[in-house]
Design a protein with these regions (language model features):
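Nucleotide-activated chemistry modules centered on ATP-dependent adenylation/adenylyltransferase
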Residues: 1-226
Length: 226
């Protein structure tokens, strides 16, 4: 199996659940978007996936997207899966989609081309149950971007915990955003979890805020023994 991997909570938790089910993950597949506006792929601090790959002790294959075109994103994903299929003889792709039929259909069409299975461990999972499970399973998750009404600079750089999850739930009810952030309302990076052999520590970062949305730009991370 290969796992579409962005380093955020969804792809990492899907990887975790796949391994819990006894699936062997041979490689991580990471696409580097041309723009933060990508409909298919996560972009903030995507370079850190190489360190997360080391923490997981799973090899990573990357490919860079050169435009904002959906067709270009699709073609670059096709190239990535073709490479994984050739090099690792994969039989399936794990992805972290929860409710996006658009995303799932795009991924599924490529899987059908290579006759491999699309595995979606989070599909249709209740948002609160999912977010709570992340904490129950000792995932250390930092919020690295916000871009929705109700989410301000207070959340940028914070580590998800039970207290701020309750606050996020109330705000999601009030402002109507997805608690799981699947619509891009916020982005995350996983710093530690049970399948990491090492944990990540952020050494340097900077917050940017334009009045409506913001990002934590991480410039230095290192790996620590657990």
């Amino acid at each position: 199996m290969a796992c579409l991997f962005s380093g955020g909570k969804d792809s990492t938790y899907s990887l975790y659940l796949a391994k819990q089910r006894g699936l062997s993950i041979e490689c991580l597949l990471t696409l580097i978007p041309h723009s933060a506006e990508s409909y298919l792929f996560h972009s903030p601090n995507i370079w850190a996936t190489k360190l997360q790959s080391q923490a997981l002790q799973i090899p990573i294959i990357t490919n860079k997207i050169n435009s904002t075109s959906i067709d270009d994103e699709y073609n670059k994903l096709d190239e990535l899966i073709s490479r994984a299929y050739t090099e690792y003889k994969i039989e399936g792709i794990v992805h972290g989609g929860i409710r996006s039929n658009f995303q799932k259909n795009k991924f599924n069409s490529i899987c059908e081309k290579y006759n491999v299975e699309l595995i979606s461990p989070l599909w249709q999972m209740d948002d609160y149950v999912y977010m709570n499970n992340l904490l129950k399973n000792d995932f250390v998750i930092q919020i690295t971007s916000v871009s929705s009404m109700g989410l301000n600079t207070n959340f940028l750089g914070t580590i998800l915990n039970y207290s701020n999850l309750k606050e996020l739930f109330k705000l999601s009810q009030q402002y109507g955003f997805n608690l799981s952030f699947e619509g891009g309302e916020a982005e995350t990076i996983v710093l530690d979890c049970p399948i990491f052999k090492k944990r990540l520590e952020i050494l340097a970062s900077k917050i940017y805020w334009d009045g409506q949305r913001g990002i934590v730009e991480i410039s230095d991370i290192h790996l620590l023994d657990k």
